[in-house]
UniProtKB/Swiss-Prot annotation:
Its EC number is 3.1.26.-. Residues 9-19 have a biased composition (Pro residues). Residues 1031-1200, 1241-1389 form the RNase III domain. This is Endoribonuclease Dicer homolog 3b. SMART domains: DEXDc, HELICc, PAZ, RIBOc. It comes from Oryza sativa subsp. japonica. One of its GO terms (biological process) is siRNA processing. The lineage of its organism: Eukaryota, Viridiplantae, Streptophyta, Embryophyta, Tracheophyta. It is found in: Nucleus. It holds the Pfam family DEAD.
């Protein structure tokens, strides 16, 4: 027989295609679609047949089956869109992930349908019912693998009634237990609504070949019955073949490989046996006598056997040259595993594998000829090597086929092989040795069960290269047989013959190009192979004949629609059958708590009774139940299925499986205000989410008594001030209010901080009651209105310049309305001494003020823009030079100094500093303009022109006056304004601005300057008192019967934004631990059958921010939260008219804000904290959660655990803590058998210095879950859960009480370090507790031993205390510390103090701030923020090893470091450690930057960068002819920057550019100017008296430094924006960036 033999079926001549258009869908979307007009009339026939009924289309590959499916999908969608059919989806099933991707892309290209793709890679297995409903609701067609659909149907996430059309790609698989068959049998036939079915296949027979026509007919009938469809085959294929041309079948024969390598094989076998013995010998060490190491050994031995088998197969079938490539491939795959393995036992076994491979490679290379590679490059090299037996004839034949292709690069050839290793090795051989330089060669393998398989992404990438012609020769397994579209494939070679008819038909169909060839490589003289080929070809004829000519009812079979063993949930319709329950039980066990040393899994034990099988199922200890016995059954496999079915029923009844029969997981929190179309809103309790809330009114300040006509009795509270500097005196005041304050609100003390370095100690003490008559009340009311408006507001509104009528606020007939929510009086006291027994109100000062107002009332005349003339005194007579005539009186010049006066023309209150004896009103006004030309000739001229005032005594000396100023927030410690390194103040007291005014324009007020100075302190004092009253009000609402200090509650509701000397941060930290502790105890007692994982999930849900937010909102806590700094400019006393109103634009008429979607935002631009005049303010949602935690912490500090429980229950947190259940726990533990471990337990008790009353608790606490595999039904996991919260509370409580002056952020770091697994593990090793651990894991023992060794080496090295060592810390060591704590806690009846007595010595020495070591990556990030540099990090992987590369650009040096590890976190830590070491060499460390950080955080708290600059600074003018891009390797092209011109926009854009290019942050400096009058900017008069100019310096590494000065602005941030904008424009000129506004 000739080597080349033509195919049995010659290709018929092609026919022209008919033009029969398919009805199109109405356009719906904007996506263009490709033409779906049927290629041939035959396809139209198939389509119409499918419309008439369920159809199985049998068509060759490439003939258009998928197009028919797309046409059907479009038709079904058209009916739904037209309203002709109810809303249902089309489900397109494909058996592989690759086909799912391919069909998804086809549907997207050829339709405008809304299509979704589902595969295992898309994590569909994690979807719940709601997610499925959402996805199905918004898509018209879903492409998925059949197992996903089967699972969705079983769990009732999807029902058959929701599907209008089922499309089965490669439907010949619908047999046996394949998901295709399961879908039909379990759900299709039992559904009241049955969707249409369309199946596609190239061959309906999936076996090795039908021996008779009858057998073929049986296969077809069975497929039709399963899919409830009829086979449809096109009889006349001529027209189809014009689009899918037939392939020429060519047989290539090769000689059998007769070379004998018995000597080599025997040596390889000896080595294999030898290394197998060495593997067995690994078990002799003590750590390897456990089940897990047995499993590793068994797996390792099987792997070695498989590797050996592959080598022998390659030697027998391919020859020793390719076998050497096989061994090299094995070495390359195992070496990375060996290098990165951290388990000593596994590493040792892998090293033995490597040794075997090296020995095998050495043996093989010994028999290979020298220079065989060069020989292969010669023309006859392969023939020579074949003759000598170094490559098989089969491989040589393949080489000759490739040679026959010539040098054409248009060849696209698929070479099918059976084994992955064959594809890899032959591909390497061809590419590396054979000289086929004109061809690009690669391989493509699949199969998720094989370690050698390529990932789906790599498969798709390789296939795309092949389609594009960038790969010519592609070695592949059966992954490309089914349905993969490679239309330009010119040749298909079956290096290994197809095993089934389907494989034959489908691989032949891959050759789609005209004149393509399908080459079968057949061993010469092998009759078995020839018969196999003949049977497959014969079956093709049988299939065609059966489909065309058989009788419709020729054969009939019974179809088992659904197994009799099922379980259904009536509420959802979820249904499971016995055969799927085993996997469901395994899935349930996978959800149980596990670690590296213990994987919970079910155990089946089958016994035989009277010839029947009965199975006992045992579940892990932490499952809902431990064992169940199934019914008798006819087979062992069925008995496992039935007992699993019974177990699933019981798990569902116990609530472990939900109503969809899915293992129960914690449902996501129910979030308020969220709907399906509002996904942009972040969840409650998050920082990103902003909510609008109101402010709770202080009830103690509410009232209407100021308007009472009768005598009123008020409570009095004396306010005294004592300055820490001599000579600074402040008058005392009295606060009068109707209600009586709590005894810890008054008396109270507070410190007021003044600049520079001045402090005023303030006390508020109750002084009993006082009765005021109507007259006194009126005068006191007038005094308060006069002074607070005169100092902080205005007594006159309107001006001559503005054109508005000048209006006196005290004009007759007008009364200032007092806010009923703020009702109190502040009156001066006569004696300003610090301690005063009696209370003496300074009525003279009060009445003097009233007299001044009366005088203005009586003298006010018609023209309200002119000063009343009768207020001005007569001309001075002779001899009165020492008398100064004021507006209301005349005084001796010696009495005028330090008096308080009121300006008639401005209505402002001043303090007289001195007389300016050498200056009168007739003198030049130029001095007031600081040397500039003045438009006024004199003071007389100035007052006449500006105010219309005629000076009557121009000869009088002017008075030098100190202007009144705005109130300041004096509650914020100015110590934070000190330079951390020098101690010098960073902010200085502003230069005082003085006024020069003629005396006759001033009204003298009979009050002292001490009284006036005290007014500036009162806003801060009253604000603090209001806060204390608010906290006291909240305390009354909570209603605990014991006293909780009001200062604690105030601290708990005060956020950092308030800029106070205290905040909720510390209490929040403590409250978090208290919540975790209380909820943990309650859950532990309440749910004795819940495992640790479930308890942890329940606790997390109970104390998460979303839950706490809900509780806080329920109690209206948001109204009490103090979330903004005290703003004295907006503070008003009762009777004071606000100069800075903030009208409410929130759309709410009440102070309370309802819970509604429109009052929630996640836009970061929303300003948080600033309230409107109704008290509405935007607040971070997390702030409310933080306050709940802080209040719990406050009550715990003030009243212990009982008070904390009270406030938690007040919030609505469900806490029971039934202590009767504790005795049940102890009783159950007492039954644990501890006799065999009594010596071990007593020894451990001695180390703990505590004797357990219930020894079983300690035994349970030291028992690892891995012992469950040996029959132990208890472990430490639940005790670990309890002990975790106990130790967390104890350590947090210790830190809170001990480190009172530590920053809250550092306190959090300390707690994290103290409760870390590393710290607990070190304590366990230090006290030798680990030796008592009961476990059944050799890997665990090995890791503990290695860690103990590493720990002992580091002992005594103080600098390495709690450093992150290279040796991984076994989590188990930390777990047993927590579990023992839980055991002690239970044994002592929940006595936390006794637990602390026992564990404090064990954990000592406790970490202190000076010993705290941050994780390297965290430390590096903080250091980068301090030095103003950006850290760049890139992650790659090499095998199982993760590689982290970090780069940090300093001023003129780029630091680069790498970290390698199997764990990404550890690799990141290693890289960060190397960067830190480099920085330390340059004198940069986090400790050195801490003092500077304090300075920077205060001066420019919104900008985290270094304000100092160094080095030479070049002006931007020097850069005009310099192209910076030439000196910057990092800038490849211009960076496109979005630029917002609003405040902060230019700075953000510049910072983003620096981050992208890894430049250091820019540096800013300020110059401030102060003016006597409001400054004019851009032609408009502003309300500001200060201006700022910012200078920006940007250092570009390895290039230059650019400096710019911005324009003048009224605040620092705007000045920074101006400078940043100029810098951006220059960088754009230099072609570094493109700014887009």
């Amino acid at each position: 027989m000739a080597d080349d033999e033509a195919a049995v079926l010659p290709p018929p001549p092609p026919l022209p295609p008919p033009c029969r258009p398919h009805r199109q869908l109405r356009p719906r979307g904007s996506r263009p679609t490709a033409d779906t007009t049927p290629r041939t009339s035959q396809l139209v026939e198939v389509f119409e047949a499918a419309l008439r009924g369920n159809t199985i289309a049998v068509l060759d590959t490439g003939s258009g089956k998928t197009m028919v499916a797309v046409m059907l999908a479009r038709e079904h969608a058209r009916r739904v869109r037209a309203g002709e059919a109810p809303r249902r989806i089309v489900v397109f099933l494909a058996p592989t992930v690759h086909l799912v991707h391919q069909q998804f892309e086809v549907i997207r290209e050829y339709t405008d349908l809304d299509v979704m793709m589902c595969s295992g890679a898309s994590r569909v297995g994690e979807w719940g019912a709601d997610h499925w409903k959402e996805e199905v609701g918004r898509n018209e067609i879903v492409v998925m693998t059949p197992q996903i659909l089967l699972d969705a149907l079983r769990h009732a996430f999807l029902t058959m009634s929701a599907v209008s059309l089922l499309i089965f790609d490669e439907c010949h698989r619908a047999c046996g237990s394949h998901p295709y068959a399961r879908i039909m049998k379990e759900f299709y036939f039992g559904s009241q609504w049955r969707p249409d079915v369309f199946g596609m296949t190239a061959s309906p027979v999936a076996t090795k070949g039908a021996s008779t026509l009858h057998n073929c007919e049986a296969h077809i009938s069975q497929l039709e019955l399963t899919l409830d469809a009829k086979i449809y085959i096109v009889e006349d294929r001529n027209e189809l073949e014009s689009f899918s041309p037939p392939t020429t079948i060519v047989n290539k024969y090769y000689d059998a490989y007769m070379v004998d390598f018995d000597n080599l094989k025997s040596k390889l076998q000896i080595f294999s046996d030898e290394f197998d013995s060495l593997l067995v010998g690994l078990q002799e060490s003590p750590s390897n006598k456990f089940k897990d190491t047995d499993n590793i050994l068994e797996t390792s031995r099987k792997s070695l056997s498989r590797y050996h088998g592959k080598i022998l197969y390659s030697l027998n079938d391919l020859g020793p040259i390719i076998t050497s490539e096989v061994v090299k491939i094995h070495i390359e795959s195992v070496k990375p595993l060996c290098d990165s393995e951290d388990c000593i036992f596994s590493k040792a076994s892998l090293c033995l594998h490597m040794s075997y491979f090296k020995e095998a490679l050495s043996l093989i290379e010994e028999i290979l000829p020298q220079g065989y590679g060069e020989l292969m490059k010669s023309e006859s090299g392969s023939e020579e090597l074949t003759k000598r037996g170094y490559i098989s004839s089969k491989v040589n034949t393949l080489i000759n086929i490739f040679k026959s292709f010539g040098s054409s690069n248009e060849v696209l050839c698929l070479i099918f092989v059976d084994r992955i290793i064959t594809a890899k090795a032959v591909e390497r051989f061809m590419r590396g040795i054979v000289n086929f330089s004109c061809f690009s060669i690669s391989y493509l393998t699949g199969g998720s069960t094989s370690k050698d398989a390529l990932s789906p992404a790599v498969q798709r990438f390789t296939l795309d290269l092949f389609r594009a012609g960038k790969v010519n020769l592609l070695f592949t397994t059966d992954v490309t047989e089914e349905g993969v579209d490679v239309p330009n494939c010119s040749c298909v070679i079956r290096f290994d013959l197809p095993r089934t008819v389907c494989s034959y038909v489908q691989s032949r169909g891959r050759a789609r190009r005209n004149n393509s060839e399908f080459i079968l490589m057949i061993e010469r003289g092998n009759l078995q192979q020839q018969e196999h080929i003949f049977r497959m070809i014969q079956t093709g004829y049988y299939v065609k004949n059966c489909a065309l000519y058989r009788h419709p009812n020729a054969l009939s079979y019974d179809l088992s629609i659904q197994g009799m063993y099922t379980y259904q949930v009536q509420s959802t319709g979820a249904t499971i059958t016995a055969d799927c329950c085993v996997n469901l039980i395994r899935k349930y066990c996978e959800k149980l708590p596990k670690d590296r040393y213990f994987m919970p899994k079910p155990s089946f034990e089958v016994t035989i009774e009277d010839g029947l099988f009965k199975c006992t199922l045992t579940l892990p200890r932490n499952a809902a139940f431990q064992s169940i016995v199934g019914p008798l059954s006819s087979s062992s496999n069925l008995s496992k299925q039935l007992v699993s079915l019974e177990a699933c029923k019981k798990l569902h009844q116990l609530g472990e499986l939900n109503d969809h029969l899915v293992p129960l997981t914690e449902e996501p929190m129910d979030t308020d205000f969220t709907t399906a179309d509002e996904k942009c809103i972040s969840g409650p309790g998050t920082t990103k989410r902003k909510e609008l809330h109101g402010t709770t009114c202080v009830l103690a300040l509410s009232g209407t008594w100021i308007h009472d006509s009768e005598n009123i009795t008020l409570n009095t509270y004396r306010i005294d001030f004592l300055c820490d500097q001599e000579g600074e005196n402040y008058a005392g005041f009295v606060l009068l209010m109707e209600p009586e304050l709590d005894d810890d609100v008054a008396p109270s003390k507070m410190d007021l901080f003044l600049i520079p370095n001045k402090m005023v100690y303030t006390t508020v003490t109750p002084r009993g009651k006082v009765q005021l008559n109507k007259k006194q009340l009126g005068k006191g009311k007038l005094f308060q209105e006069f002074f607070f408006n005169g100092i902080f507001g205005r007594l006159f509104h309107g001006s001559r310049k503005s054109g508005a009528q000048r209006d006196f606020i005290f004009k007759k007939g007008h009364e200032i309305q007092w806010n009923t929510e703020s009702m109190y009086l502040l009156l001066p006291l006569r004696d300003s001494s610090y301690i005063q027994d009696d209370l003496s109100i300074h009525w003279e000062a009060i009445e003097s003020c009233a007299g001044a107002v009366e005088q203005l009332w009586s003298s006010y005349q018609g023209d309200e823009n002119v000063i009343p003339v009768n207020c001005i005194p007569q001309k001075r007579r002779g001899g009165q030079e020492e008398i100064i005539h004021l507006a209301n009186k005349s005084l001796h010049c010696s009495s005028i100094k330090d008096s308080v006066v009121l300006s008639l023309h401005t209505g402002r209150i001043y303090t007289v500093l001195d007389l300016i004896l050498d200056t009168t009103a007739e003198d030049s006004f130029d001095e007031m303009c600081k040397g500039k030309a003045s438009p006024f000739t004199s003071f007389v001229d100035y007052y006449h022109q500006k105010y219309g005032i005629i000076i009557q005594h121009p000869e009088q000396p002017l008075l030098l006056l100190k202007q009144s100023h705005n109130a300041h927030n004096l509650l914020f410690s100015k110590l934070k304004y000190l330079d951390g390194s020098t101690g010098k103040p960073l902010l200085m007291e502003k230069e005082q601005i003085h006024a020069r005014v003629p005396p006759e324009l001033l009204i003298h007020l009979d009050v002292t300057t001490d009284i006036l100075k005290s007014f500036y302190l009162l806003p801060s004092v009253i604000h603090r008192l209001q806060s204390l009253m608010l906290a006291s009000q909240l305390r009354r609402e909570i209603g605990y019967n014991q006293h909780i200090p009001v200062t604690l509650i105030l601290e708990a509701i005060t956020t950092l934004r308030c800029c106070e000397t205290f905040s909720l941060e510390r209490l929040e930290l403590l409250g978090d631990s208290v919540l975790k502790y209380v909820v943990g105890c309650d859950l532990f007692l309440r749910y004795p059958m819940k495992h640790e994982g479930q308890l942890s999930d329940m606790r997390s849900k109970a104390v998460c921010n979303a839950t706490l937010h809900k509780h806080g909102i329920w109690r209206s806590l948001q109204g009490y939260v103090r979330d903004n700094a005290f703003d004295p400019r907006r503070w008003v006393a009762p009777g004071q008219i606000s100069l800075r109103p903030f009208p409410c634009n929130c759309g709410i008429e009440t102070a309370f804000v309802p819970s509604h979607r429109r009052y929630i935002r996640d836009d970061p631009s929303f300003f948080v904290g600033k309230p409107c005049d109704r008290g509405h303010r935007w607040m971070c949602s997390k702030t409310i959660s933080d306050c709940v935690e802080a209040l719990v912490g406050a009550y715990y500090v003030g009243g212990g655990i009982a008070a904390a429980l009270w406030v938690m229950r007040w919030f609505g947190i469900d806490i029971k803590c039934d202590m009767k259940l504790l005795q049940e726990v102890k009783f159950n533990a007492s039954h644990l058998c501890s006799l065999s471990k009594i010596n071990d337990i007593e020894e451990l008790e001695a180390k703990l210095k505590y004797n357990f009353s219930v020894k079983g608790l300690l035994l349970e606490a030291i028992t690892h879950p891995s012992l469950q595999e040996l029959g132990v039904d208890y472990c430490y996991q639940r005790l670990e859960f309890l002990g975790d919260s106990v130790l967390d509370l104890l350590l947090t409580r210790h830190l809170y009480a001990t480190h009172t002056d530590v920053d809250p952020g550092e306190l959090t770091d300390l707690r994290s370090a103290l409760v870390s697994n590393e710290n607990f593990a070190q304590a366990v090793v230090r006290n030798n507790i680990h030796s008592h651990l009961q476990h059944g894991s050799g890997i665990l023992l090995e890791q503990i031993t290695e860690y103990v060794r590493s720990n002992l080496e580091c002992q005594g090295k103080e600098s390495e205390f709690l450093q992150h060592t290279t040796c991984k810390v076994p989590k188990v060591l930390g777990d047993i510390m927590e579990s023992i704590a839980g055991a002690v806690f239970i044994d002592t009846d929940f006595n936390v103090d006794m637990v602390w007595e026992i564990f404090e010595p064990l954990l000592s020495p406790l970490i202190t701030p000076d010993k705290l070591a941050l994780p390297p990556y965290r430390e590096l990030l903080e250091l980068c923020s301090h030095i103003g540099c950006f850290l760049n990090s890139k992650c790659t992987s090499k095998g199982e090893e993760v590689i982290i590369e970090m780069s940090l650009q300093l001023r003129d040096e780029l630091l680069v470091a790498q970290g390698h590890d199997r764990n990404k976190k550890r690799a990141k830590a290693k890289a960060a450690s190397r960067i830190l070491a480099d920085l330390k060499q340059q004198g940069l460390s986090i400790k050195q930057c801490l003092s500077k950080a304090k300075q920077l955080d205060i001066v420019t708290s919104d900008l985290q960068f270094d304000l100092t600059s160094s080095g030479t600074q070049l002006s931007y003018s020097d850069l005009n002819d310099y192209h910076i891009l030439e000196g910057l390797s990092s800038v490849k092209k211009e960076v496109v920057l979005p630029l917002k011109m609003e405040k902060g926009g230019p700075r953000s854009a510049l910072f983003k550019l620096c981050k992208i290019l890894q430049w250091p942050m820019p540096e800013f400096e300020f110059v401030e100017q102060r003016f006597r009058t409001p400054i004019v900017m851009d032609g408009a008069t502003t309300t500001n008296f200060n201006s700022f100019v910012s200078t920006i310096t940007l250092h570009i590494p390895d290039a230059t430094t650019i400096t710019f000065q911005g324009e003048r602005r009224t605040d620092k941030k705007s000045a920074q924006d101006s400078a940043s904008l100029m810098m951006l424009h220059k960088l754009q000129e230099l072609k570094i960036c493109i700014c887009k506004t």
